[in-house]
């Protein structure tokens, strides 16, 4: 077995070229077993096996620097750079992250997880190399899906000016997470069709040299191409045509479904844990499709992640032209939504919290200054969301809640969410964002009659005295739990408030609390700095009201344990009660 003997790239070079396909199969076998038990990004890694072997066969990592875009396709790279045990031994599966990480290896240069960044990052490495008078190759690896992102195109535009060694390997599998969208993919298709020979070549048009490899899963062909461009003195694109999910029939057949997988049965490809519970994605999709049937102005927008809103391939077909995928281009999604709204449409944009930061300028400039009535729904903005350091959803509250004109709402239940959507999709006075709760969806069957157009009116769910607990969104349930425990342990009848609004204060209610309360507790699912609780604390600043803010510390967490993080931040009912009693 070749893989067991590989401790670094130097061991790859010892294998004869005609034996490298054996190594490729061993890598796929290991990936398959690990994915079936552990889950992870599937299709991107299976398609990149030969290219990764060829890169390490030809180049001298880490002297030659390889930068992976997103880096979700870096599993084979990790296996060849001293981390194979994390893929061969089940007890070591969690030793590595799902993305490149300089803390793991000198062969990783950046911690990344968002798309379209590799060309710009690698261009910076190349520029620094040139300024220092050093040599060595710099290689940016980027997938065709990531080319729809603005930063990728900006990076390509700059790359031509380097006029020194810079290699851009474009892994073209004719897929993003789902199908690609955008005009540039017509050119990629033409390049594939003509074996890279067409004169209409977007890379050449940007001033880059160009090499095409049709057999992108043929390790010998890749080695030949990489040897041709090694030590080149001009920026060059090596465009390789690969098969996403190669080597596992279900993944080759259903590429979108197998972009990422949970644990599954290898023989059948069926998931071991079939989640059939209703969630906010399916609720959103059902709601929008129903709206679309009766209103042609309703438009659902995604930036390369259609299933975040529940729009699987069949649902996208059902929506037809009322569903728009702009590619991995969050900025364009927001600006497009603003344009649709200004011209009388009803745009809905669904996005992961981690990607909201990429939209900040457009939300502020193109939407809120213009007061465009868009609806923007934030998914996974929670401690219960994705837990990789590159995909944390902790920062959307301070980012969005401080933009003028925006109404940022936080439902605690399915019914509240749908009521907010009903209001937001029909009103024309405000841009609206909705932060979905983390964790399992709560549905209490209640009928929500609240008029959300009467801004910043909190709801008192239970009237008490002395202590008021304001639980925002996800943590409204925690507020109720803490109040119940206070009554059981200290006979304190606490007021419980569902604020709904992240962007504004119910000053009348907060003022009224001064009459018979001496402590206000705020709970929010995000970082405290610049967040919801600080606004409450500032309101009471010169009064005698004691304010206790609970949320998350400002820090980067990686692959964390949710319960541990909650306890560290005193976000349990028991700890909150203990804190209250300690100061009473």
Feature roles, as predicted:
Residues 39-48, 67-72, 101-120, 142-146, ...:
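Active-site nucleophile and cofactor-binding loops and adjacent substrate-binding regions
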Residues 29-36, 95-111, 133-139, 312-327, ...:
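Glycine/charged-rich beta-loop-alpha catalytic/anionic-binding loops adjacent to active sites
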Residues 86-96, 161-175, 368-380:
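A glycine-rich helix N-cap at a beta->alpha junction
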Residues 108-264, 270-277, 282-284, 406-517:
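Glycine-rich ThDP/TPP pyrophosphate-binding loop and its adjacent helix/strand module
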């Amino acid at each position: 077995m070749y893989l067991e003997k590989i401790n670094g790239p130097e061991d790859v070079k010892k294998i004869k070229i005609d034996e490298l396909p054996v190594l490729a199969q061993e890598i796929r076998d290991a990936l398959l077993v690990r994915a079936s038990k552990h889950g992870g990004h599937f299709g991107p890694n299976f398609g990149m096996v030969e290219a990764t072997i060829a890169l390490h066969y030809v180049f001298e990592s880490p002297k030659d620097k390889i930068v992976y875009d997103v880096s979700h396709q870096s599993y084979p790279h990790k296996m060849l750079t001293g981390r194979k045990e994390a893929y061969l031994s089940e007890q070591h599966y969690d030793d590595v992250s799902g993305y490149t990480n300089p803390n793991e290896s000198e062969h990783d240069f950046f911690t990344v997880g968002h798309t379209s960044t590799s060309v710009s990052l690698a261009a910076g490495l190349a520029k620094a190399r040139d300024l220092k008078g050093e040599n060595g190759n710099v290689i940016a690896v980027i997938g065709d899906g990531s080319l729809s992102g603005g930063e990728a195109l900006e990076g390509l535009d700059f790359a031509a000016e380097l006029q020194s060694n810079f290699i851009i390997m474009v892994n073209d599998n004719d897929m993003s997470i789902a199908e690609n969208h955008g005009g540039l993919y017509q050119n990629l298709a033409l390049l594939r069709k003509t074996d890279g020979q067409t004169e209409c070549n977007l890379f050449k048009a940007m001033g880059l040299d160009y090499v095409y490899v049709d057999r992108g899963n043929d390790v010998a062909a890749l080695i030949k191409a990489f040897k041709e461009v090694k030590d080149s003195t001009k920026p060059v694109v090596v465009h390789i045509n690969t098969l996403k999910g190669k080597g596992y029939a279900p993944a080759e057949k259903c590429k979108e479904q197998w972009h990422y997988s949970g644990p599954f049965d290898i023989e059948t490809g069926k998931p071991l844990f079939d989640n059939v519970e209703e969630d906010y994605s399916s609720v959103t999709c059902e709601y929008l499709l129903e709206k679309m049937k009766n209103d042609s102005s309703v438009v659902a927008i995604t930036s390369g992640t259609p299933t975040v809103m529940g729009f699987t391939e069949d649902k996208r077909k059902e929506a037809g032209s009322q569903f728009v995928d702009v590619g991995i281009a969050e900025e364009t999604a927001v600006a497009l939504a603003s344009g649709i709204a200004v011209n009388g449409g009803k745009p809905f944009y669904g996005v992961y919290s981690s990607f909201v930061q990429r939209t900040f300028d457009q939300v502020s400039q193109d939407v809120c200054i213009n007061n465009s009535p868009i609806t923007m729904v934030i998914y996974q903005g929670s401690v219960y969301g994705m837990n990789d350091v590159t995909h944390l959803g902790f920062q959307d509250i301070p980012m969005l809640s401080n933009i003028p004109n925006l109404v940022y709402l936080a439902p605690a239940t399915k019914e509240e969410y749908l009521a907010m959507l009903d209001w937001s999709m029909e009103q024309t006075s405000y841009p609206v964002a909705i932060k979905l709760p983390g964790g399992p969806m709560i549905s209490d069957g209640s009928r929500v009659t609240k008029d959300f157009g009467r801004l910043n009116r909190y709801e008192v769910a239970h009237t008490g005295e002395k202590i008021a607990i304001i639980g925002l969104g996800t943590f409204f349930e925690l507020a109720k739990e803490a109040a119940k425990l206070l009554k059981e342990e200290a006979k304190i009848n606490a007021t419980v408030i569902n604020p709904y609004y992240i962007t504004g204060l119910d000053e009348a209610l907060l003022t009224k609390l001064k009459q018979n309360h001496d402590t206000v507790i705020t709970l929010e699912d995000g970082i405290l700095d610049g967040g919801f609780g600080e606004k409450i604390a500032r309101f009471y600043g010169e009064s005698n009201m004691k304010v206790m803010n609970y949320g998350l510390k400002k820090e980067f967490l990686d692959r964390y344990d949710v319960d541990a993080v909650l306890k560290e931040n005193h976000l349990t009912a028991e700890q909150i009660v203990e804190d209250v009693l300690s100061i009473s």
